[in-house]
Structure formats: structure tokens, C-alpha cells
Amino acid sequence: MAMLTTSDLLRRVPIFAGLTQAQISQLSGNVTKRRFKRGELIVEQGQKSGALFLILSGRARVSLTDKRAKEVILNTLGPGDCVGEMSLIDGQSHSASVRTDVQTDVLVLSHEEFVRCLAENHSIALWIMKDLVQRLRKSSDMVSSLALMDVYGRVAKVLIDAAQPHGESDAVVCEKMTRQDIAKMVGASREMVSRVMRDFEEQGFIKTNDNGSFVLQEHRLVLR
């Protein structure tokens, strides 16, 4: 199998979907490829990186950590997602950390090249605007669930949001999600999440597979 060129990789990133071949070729000479091992930080909360990171493969989590090292997981990122654009736009430090869950390959675009791309390609600016709006909506949704739902409802929402269609009534959570990770997403203790998951299993709402993924009876797992 032929090795993919930088131009081939750029075409796979949604933010560059509106670029011409000539623009892709120009951009390909100004990005670098980098590999992060599992558990490495791509960007760190409170710091500046001065670059845009475009995820090609792998998975990373967006999280906030307080002075007591308590972590809250805000989002999970995968292929096609961008990291660091907010800091590049407003010049401030990163509002959250992004750490890899598995080995993750990224393309790195410098601040200068990012600004040039924004100025010359309106499609990139529009894509970023849409992406930021989606993140804002997701943040509002998260605040709403924390304020208005009990722990059972918040855990159910995390599972449903992460699920992929499978059959007519079931949905499968493709990636392994530990009780600790779910606890960090819903603002509860690991013990409480374990109790909720056990109740869901006893009531037939979910089934845990040997590999750690879940099968959901989504029509029965009603948000509370």
C-alpha cells in the first residue's frame, strides 16, 4: 500500500474540505506530522502552544483540572477534530487540557500559517465558526444536564451520546468507557456511577461486554 502524502492527509481533515488542489499543495509544505503516545498532553490548560493540531487518528479527551487535581471530562475528540484554535484566535492560554487516550497522530499548523489560511480561505473561517458554535451548544447542554438531571439521568445521557446505532432497538458504545471516566463526565463519584450502572444492568437497560463496551436498550434508557 502506497504511503499517504501530506496532501492526502490534509484532504481527510474536514476543515480543509473547501480548499482547491493548489491550496492544499501550498499548505502541505507548511504543516508537520507528529505522533503522541497514549497519555501525552497535546495542549495543557493555562498554557499556550502557538499551533493548531489536526487529529488524523486516535482519540483524546478534553478536560479541566482544579488545584486539587480533580478532573472533569468535557469532550472526546477523534479523527478530523481540531485542537488549539480558540487560543490561536484570542491569543489567550488554553482553557482546557487535551490528553490522548490512545496513540494519536496529528498534523501541526503554526500560528502564522493558521492566520494566513483564515485570511485567504473563507471556508476555513466558516468551518471554525460552525465548530465553535457546536462546542458552545454542547457546553450549554452539559450545564443544563448538571443543573436539571439527577445522576441517573446524567449517566444515561453520557451513554446515549456515545452510542452508535446497532440493530433496530439497541445501540453499542463502541469505545471502552471506565466507571471513572463516566464519573468525570457527570460530576459524580466513581462509587455512585458504579451503583447507577449496576442498577441499569439489573433493570435490563444495558449490558456490559467483556471488552468494556456497552450494549444499550436506548428506547428503555430514558433520560430522567
Task: Give residue ranges: language-model regions.
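Cyclic nucleotide-binding regulatory module and flanking cytosolic helices
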Residues: M1-R38, V83, S87-L88, E120
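Long cytosolic regulatory regions associated with cyclic-nucleotide signaling
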Residues: M1-T6, Q21-I24, M86-S87, I128-D131, ...
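Cyclic nucleotide-binding regulatory domains
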Residues: I15, E40-V102
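Short aromatic/basic micro-patch
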Residues: G18, L52, T76, V108, ...
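Cyclic-nucleotide recognition modules
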Residues: Q23, L74-R137
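Conserved phosphate/pyrophosphate-binding and hydrolysis machinery centered on Walker-type P-loop NTPases
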Residues: I42, K48, S145-Y152, V172-E175
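Short helix-to-loop capping/linker segments positioned immediately adjacent to catalytic or ligand/cofactor-binding
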Residues: A96, V115-A119, K138-L148, H166-S169
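Phosphate-/nucleic-acid-contacting segments
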Residues: V151, V158-R224
